[in-house]
Amino acid sequence: VFKLEGSDNIKLVVDELPNFRTRDLVVMWGTIEGEPFYFLVSHWPSRLGGKEASQFKRDACAKQIKEIKDELIAQNPATKVIVMGDFNDDATDASITKVMGAKGKEKELVEGDFFNPFNQMLRAGLGTLAYQDVWNLFDNICVTENLVNAEEGKLRIIKGKKFYGNIFTRPYMLQQEGQYKGYPLRTFVTNNFQNGFSDHFPVYIYIGK
């Protein structure tokens, strides 16, 4: 059971655009079975105007999240940090792998690193949203190395049959026919109500001992 100790919202800053407004970073902290956890939830700026032209905005978010994580680990190396959200970048994009420093393989991890279990899932052809028949994986959950290489008896990320990450899908969540068969069933297409749930599939991980 997660015991909440506090929460806050942090303004995401893009240095090149001091007046730029985007969604805040929502954070909360507390304990699970006595172990310190810190959660960050973030929805990064869109690719409006093109991926490359808007990249610096998402890079700024990634940089700020890494700085927060580094400070938390420096203060208490036992803190287990989890960041999640729609990053509007794929798990293999440089904003996540380079700027935020999230590694895709356990063997690459060093103390304090982020691990992104969805990196290998994207490389295997899985995704949470599709555009022009190409799957993307913008929805990520990254955890600090101490949730991968946890001490015996401590909480850790649990691996499934093949991956540490999971994408939740059910038939009622899928477009059943037409050009977009197999895509997530959206709530709206332009102004037309589709009675769907989202244009993204949700993602999740398991934490246990």
Locate predicted features:
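Structured beta-strand-rich core segments of catalytic domains in phosphoester-bond hydrolases
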Residues: 1-36, 40-44
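Second-shell loop/turn segments in exported
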Residues: 14-16, 49-58, 83-84, 126-129, ...
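Intrinsically disordered, low-complexity segments enriched in polar/charged residues with Gly/Pro
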Residues: 14-17, 69, 181-182
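Metal-dependent phosphoester-hydrolase catalytic domains
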Residues: 20, 73-79, 89-209
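Extracytoplasmic, non-cytosolic globular domains
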Residues: 26-121
